[in-house]
Amino acid sequence: ILYEQPSYRGHQYYLWKGEYPDFQRWMGFNDSIRSCRMSPYHQGQYKMRIYERGDFQGQNMEFFEDCPNTYDRFRFRDIHSCNVFDGNWMFYEEPNYRGRQYYLRPGEYRRYSDWGASSARIGSFRRVHHLV
């Protein structure tokens, strides 16, 4: 996982297996990388519950699989809070795994700022798998 700022802050980018000759290939906003870390290996189930409002309020849904388009799936674009029970997940600001990325580990995220976002808009999300 690459971060634009020191101490794992700023825009984050998860690089899947492959080649990235320039920052635009990983959909970066610029070529500045100030910190990075490996994502932990996960083997087993994936489970996450998302909520339409903060503090785990409002309509919610559980997911075990990837979702390429949140609006098509459940008719809202904003995710205000979530619980990640199992596995590591990546939120994307736009559908089809595009735009700003937010890496989520197991834990509680009471508001979108807890995963580093400046807005609640999430267009897609997927499980983080390690390719061997």
UniProtKB/Swiss-Prot annotation:
Q: Is the Repeat keyword given for this protein?
A: yes
Keyword Ion transport appears in the UniProt entry: no
Q: Which species is this UniProt entry from?
A: Xenopus laevis (African clawed frog)
What is the designated name of this protein? Gamma-crystallin-5
The record, for Pfam families, names: Crystall
What gene name is given for the protein in this entry? cryg5
Q: Its family?
A: Belongs to the beta/gamma-crystallin family.
GO BP terms, alphabetized:
lens development in camera-type eye; visual perception
Q: Where is this region: Connecting peptide?
A: 41-45
This chain's function reads:
Crystallins are the dominant structural components of the vertebrate eye lens.
Instruction: Tell me which Gene3D superfamilies the record gives.
Output: Crystallins (2.60.20.10)
Keyword set for this entry? Eye lens protein, Repeat
Molecular-function GO terms, alphabetical = structural constituent of eye lens
On subunit structure and binding partners, the annotation says: Monomer.
Which intervals hold domain Beta/gamma crystallin 'Greek key'?
1-40, 46-86, 87-129
Q: Which InterPro entries match?
A: Beta/Gamma-Crystallin (IPR050252), Beta/gamma_crystallin (IPR001064), G_crystallin-like (IPR011024)
